[in-house]
Swiss-Prot record:
Tagged with keyword Hydrolase: yes
Name of the encoding gene: pcp
Gene Ontology BP, a term: response to osmotic stress
Family membership: Belongs to the peptidase C14B family.
Plastid among keywords: no
MF terms (GO), sorted A to Z: cysteine-type endopeptidase activity
EC primary class: hydrolase
Name under which the protein is recorded: Paracaspase
Consequence of gene loss (knockout): No change in morphology and persistence of induced-cell death.
Alphabetized Pfam families for the sequence: Peptidase_C14 (PF00656)
Active site: 266, 311
Annotated region described as Caspase-like, given as residue ranges: 193-374
GO cellular component: contractile vacuolar membrane
Keyword terms: Hydrolase, Protease
Amino acid sequence: MSETFIHSVSENQIIVNDLENNNDYDNEDNVFIDSSVYNQECFMEILKKLEDGKPIHEVVRFTSHSSYTHTIVKTIQGLFLYVVLKSVNIYGSYYDFQRYIGPSMMIGTYACPLYRVQYRINKNDSTGAIIKYSNNLDECETYFNHLCKVFNVLTKRLSLNSICCGVGLSDSFYLMNTKTIKKSSRTRISFIIGNSKYSQHRKLDGVINDVNSFYCALLGCSFHSDNIVWLIDSDLRTFYDKWYTFLQLVQSFQSYIEVVVYYAGHGRSDNGNLKLIMTDGNPVQLSIIASTLTESIKNSDSLCLFIVDCCRDGENVLPFHYPIESFDDKKNIAVLFACKYGELSYESLELNAGIFTRSFVKTITERKNNNISTICNLTDIAIKRIYKNYSGCSLIGNFDCSLLEF
């Protein structure tokens, strides 16, 4: 899949080129890129309607029936949604967008970044799209920041409070007043790694879906995208480079924080030590990276949770009750496994995802506005949704899990 980039950006023109063959329309893996001239008259007319107090859904309806190019209309609509949602800190999954915006608006707005993260736009439905489905939120934000005039005016000149307080974005869906949106008083950061393509081990097809769903679940649980570091198909060197970048992020916080580290991929148990296998076959010992994390945290009351969706099988398989000393003697740190010692973590061929991660994500997404008594209970609920009376997960650690409010 070829990558696109902004070739030049000015006040009057936006040009996006394809790195491989410079075609406007490549293949079904790419979206249509319209390199038409940006029409300032269109933007200024829309801006005037907003500043005159017109409801945003009427303005969007105006743009949809205008004679301006499809790309410009969708870009502006996407920017509206992006700026408004960012102003009230609503980051979440596809279902969160349905709740606040409505599916009809989402489907019609190709430039809406979070929608594009999770849902692929196919060849027949891609006319006018400006960002490929594979771009993550940070890449989308970088692109939007290049639209200097549009972005600056929307963020500085429009009254976002009046837009957010009950003004409809579509005929039947309304944004909640910003005062009713619960914002977390706790800083939450996360490190996500998913290894799928191995040089010496079986490929894990469901890992990418696991990572994407877990990432979106965190966004819906008051994790800001700027505080999430994620890594796909990493060798040993790349992992440590990213890990120490993450530790620098952790060290930048003086106050209480909650840290979630998620891993999906191959793993093995060696003399009681769980090792995460990188794509080049080299292992990373979980207890070692846990120690580096706890040493980097400056507030002793902070919580650390490792969620590991991998096999714990190996030549030296230990019974389930065997403690992991490096975790057991640490305050406020725990590790949640998808399976017990000597067991395998399974993928669903039908769902193309890990069974544990899918169930876990579904459960915390549904319960994100409620207090969770214990991670163990939560995981039991998740697993039993698929396998009756199955309780293969395990939690090792000694902190009060009720402190974690997803």
